[in-house]
Amino acid sequence: MDHYDSQQTNDYMQPEEDWDRDLLLDPAWEKQQRKTFTAWCNSHLRKAGTQIENIEEDFRDGLKLMLLLEVISGERLAKPERGKMRVHKISNVNKALDFIASKGVKLVSIGAEEIVDGNVKMTLGMIWTIILRFAIQDISVEETSAKEGLLLWCQRKTAPYKNVNIQNFHISWKDGLGFCALIHRHRPELIDYGKLRKDDPLTNLNTAFDVAEKYLDIPKMLDAEDIVGTARPDEKAIMTYVSSFYHAFSGAQKAETAANRICKVLAVNQENEQLMEDYEKLASDLLEWIRRTIPWLENRAPENTMHAMQQKLEDFRDYRRLHKPPKVQEKCQLEINFNTLQTKLRLSNRPAFMPSEGRMVSDINNAWGCLEQAEKGYEEWLLNEIRRLERLDHLAEKFRQKASIHEAWTDGKEAMLRQKDYETATLSEIKALLKKHEAFESDLAAHQDRVEQIAAIAQELNELDYYDSPSVNARCQKICDQWDNLGALTQKRREALERTEKLLETIDQLYLEYAKRAAPFNNWMEGAMEDLQDTFIVHTIEEIQGLTTAHEQFKATLPDADKERLAILGIHNEVSKIVQTYHVNMAGTNPYTTITPQEINGKWDHVRQLVPRRDQALTEEHARQQHNERLRKQFGAQANVIGPWIQTKMEEIGRISIEMHGTLEDQLNHLRQYEKSIVNYKPKIDQLEGDHQLIQEALIFDNKHTNYTMEHIRVGWEQLLTTIARTINEVENQILTRDAKGISQEQMNEFRASFNHFDRDHSGTLGPEEFKACLISLGYDIGNDPQGEAEFARIMSIVDPNRLGVVTFQAFIDFMSRETADTDTADQVMASFKILAGDKNYITVDELRRELPPDQAEYCIARMAPYTGPDAVPGALDYMSFSTALYGESDL
């Protein structure tokens, strides 16, 4: 059988799966684990003639880790990698981890990279996994798991010792007595246990650790001070150390195993005997309870009152809820115990159990069946009796409820039917009262069924000789008499409501006609007042003319509006005549509108007053718009001249910069004269600014007489000045380049001609392909092969350092001047510094100050980095990096 099958693997690895790795962040626990795990590893590595000092460092290359596994397993691992690279280390660690996994161990979140990186938490977790697999897994006491078996072994070995109570692998060991007890139990000559004191843990711990190391060959894996100074010592460190004691004393286990075997047999026999006694007692108690309960359930004596029957039902419910469930459980447990006992006896080769007479499981089941039958008959009888009494109580309660509901419904109904609220109501209120009365009639008809039900229930109670029948009959008669009276009052009120409705309908029609015509006329007047008082905002002559035309059209509608006003007032006067003639009691005003004749007359007068005010406002605005139009035309006339002039000058400058002839000095003089002529145009720009200021003050936002805005003119003017200044600057830079590089005028003209030839869009710049064609025309050998492409990329990085994708003429001139003239280089400067330094690779401060002018010497001293070569002397400076930095080949 495989000792490391899946079941055992799960058992001994259970602590690892439950291990909270974050606890390793506790410095005290980490310290204990470091020391314990290091000592445990060294106790095995010393067999191979080696050891470790730093647990997270010495296992990083995987060599000692593989050696440790070979020692503790007695097996050979794959040949390790001897290289020093990270990949070799990871390979070795993976071989070790694969070997551990092959033993049925689950490696939870442990990877080779973390071990190689020296991750303390992962390294300690890996060593703990190894300890579990190879030092603790095989520990088993009475079929317990590894951890529980080790704990049980400790408890049994220390049980006879006072002040020792091993419950765990942390605080139970803090006083040191547990370690001393383990040693004394197996080697009593090594420790005088009677002299140990519980209040002196340091002495106890040091005594146990020293004796174990000296006489038992168990290395010292813990520090007494660390255990005492920690509230909860690390469980894994304690388990590792205690497992060493277990293996050291494993020889003493044989006698204990034999004793355990005998105890186990006796325990099984005692347990079986106890189960037999429990069965007999439980069966006797259950049968006695059934015997007492059946007569109670067979009692069928009836009760006269509902309360008494309900009490019997409540007692029966208590029996079902409180008394019977525990007995059901006892019966079930009795059967379970019987079956369990028979199984245990059969498995342990004992004879089957035979209960005493009358206490067999079948006897109990028969008695229980009799109980169930009596219980069922008793429950049916209770329910029938309760139903019989409930019927009478239900009918009486039903009569009272229906009578109460009917009486509550009729309360106030007679007073409501006698009131004359319709005499002062409006037509809508009359119609509402009629609808309400119709609803009441429907409600009255619906309640007819309830009255009939009340009479029928009273009749049934009389037939069943209900004890309180007289009061029921009196109440029923009163309800019937009241019902007849409500019917007569209902008919009388309907007739009165219908008469009043007809009288008010005529007035209502006139009110409705008034409202239909008054509302739109009122809206028209309100709209007219809003329009006449509306603040208009216009920007053109056309807009103000449109407003004036609309106002004249409005004034033409006023006579017809006045006729409509008089017609509406005539309807109101007709209503007043009808009210006076027929003495109608009007409770309120027109229900269809809140508009009164007084409001109509008041708003009409207001409209007549607003018309001349609107006339005056439109006249004043018309004059203002005429003035604004003159300002627009004045600005447009000037802008239409200045705008094209600026555009023309911009185009001329573009042509001049491309088509310049003569010497650079002649071109520069020509450009400056051209710039002067442009600057002399400034007064016209200022005059246009003045006109623009007047337009802004007049709040004029558009101008159909020109497409040019002042902002457009300003931007164009600034661009014009900037362009001529930039062109002059380019010519000045060309002169500086020519003089500095010794370029002749013929070369400059040739460069300009070549550049202009390939600048086909006259933009003043060359694209990459245009620039490449230009270089080829000047004799550069730039092919389409990889070498040619690389050379062209190098040149582009010089002329277009910002990678804008274009080459300016100035960049072109700079490049051509560097290509055709002698230049100084970083190598030349380094060679010069080497001469000053006496052929050394560095230079000193004194040499710089002796050979160079003071200001230049201090400049070099402040910027040169210290020289760090093997031949450096104090104060040596690195002139090589300084020289390359001067030419942008490194950082200065």
UniProtKB/Swiss-Prot annotation:
Record PTM N-acetylmethionine, positions in chain: 1
Main subcellular location: cytoplasm
UniProt cross-references to InterPro entries, sorted A to Z: Actinin_actin-bd_CS (IPR001589), CH_dom (IPR001715), CH_dom_sf (IPR036872), EF-hand-dom_pair (IPR011992), EF-hand_Ca_insen (IPR014837), EF_Hand_1_Ca_BS (IPR018247), EF_hand_dom (IPR002048), Spectrin/alpha-actinin (IPR018159)
Pfam family, one: EF-hand_6
Top-rank lineage group of the source organism: Eukaryota
Domain EF-hand: 746-781, 787-822
Interaction with DDN: annotated span: 274-733
Record keyword Oxidoreductase present: no
Segments of this protein annotated with the region Actin-binding: 1-247
Keywords tagged on the record: Acetylation, Actin-binding, Calcium, Cell junction, Cell membrane, Cell projection, Cytoplasm, Cytoskeleton, Membrane, Metal-binding, Phosphoprotein, Repeat
Residues recorded with modification Phosphotyrosine: 12
Gene3D superfamilies: 1.20.58.60, Calponin-like domain, EF-hand
Positions contributing to Ca(2+) binding: 759, 761, 763, 765, 770
Repeat (Spectrin) residue spans along the chain: 274-384, 394-499, 509-620, 630-733
Cellular component per GO, a single term: Z disc
Sequence positions bearing N6-acetyllysine: 95, 195, 676
Oligomeric and partner information: Homodimer; antiparallel. Interacts with MYOZ2, TTID and LPP. Interacts with DDN. Interacts with PSD. Interacts with MICALL2. Interacts with DNM2 and CTTN. Interacts with PDLIM1. Interacts with PDLIM2. Interacts with PDLIM4 (via PDZ domain). Interacts with IGSF8.
Family (UniProt): Belongs to the alpha-actinin family.
The protein, known as: Alpha-actinin-1
Gene name for this UniProt entry: ACTN1
